[in-house]
Amino acid sequence: LTGLPTSAITVNTMLMGGGFGRRAEMDVIKQAISVAQAMEGTPILLTWSREEDMTHDAYRPAAMGRVRAKLEGDRISAFDFATASSSVVESQAGRLGYAIPGPDGAIVQGAWEQPYRFANHRVTGYRAPVMVPVGSWRSVGASQNAFFHETAIDELAHLAKADPLEFRLRQIDDDASRAVLSAV
């Protein structure tokens, strides 16, 4: 980007708390290089306000989820979860000039790694291309997929005429997860 040898460049990276996905973006680096080149020989400090950061950031991907399930008494015997969103990995890699060769696992994050044990369980993720830049906001796919998943569990509890917490506990065989839900 600069045309300079790496030995002529010094970068002092600030330690920060949660970057929430923002550290994966390179636009701030390009801006810092432009400012440094315009002020040759002068050390620079580039800081974005929270408002500037949010203005220049990529969006969280829009998503859609659909669940089909089968109840047998108070147990879920089949859970078929489909989710679609744009690919964060594809969008971020594209901004760096790369393409991803296959599926983006972030689309199904939070959909399959659940403590519930169903006799029949399927998760399908669909990449839905959009023309809007998307980025890895905190938890990427788990945000929307956990919402879709848990909302479906609530709806199934309602159909089973069961208390949502008790219904969940009947579906979970992981002791640590049961302990967390029981403690709340």
Residue ranges: model-predicted function:
Residues L1-V184:
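Structural alpha/beta core scaffold segments of enzyme domains
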